[in-house]
Amino acid sequence: MKRTFQPNNRKRAKVHGFRARMKTKNGRNVLARRRLKGRHSLTVSGEK
């Protein structure tokens, strides 16, 4: 049986990246909450 996690950086960014988060109201809420919490990294495609 194939495992559920098949790493793919492009899909990772498309689904969980910063631009993907900014697209929706809820995504922006996610970013806002992570900023409030003081997360070192906001998204997977975050600061380089």
From Swiss-Prot:
Disulfide bonds: none annotated. It comes from the Bacteria. One of its GO terms (molecular function) is structural constituent of ribosome. GO terms for biological process: translation. Keywords: Ribonucleoprotein, Ribosomal protein. GO terms for cellular component: ribonucleoprotein complex; ribosome. The keyword Lipid biosynthesis does not apply. InterPro entries: Ribosomal_bL34, Ribosomal_bL34_CS. Belongs to the bacterial ribosomal protein bL34 family. This is Large ribosomal subunit protein bL34.
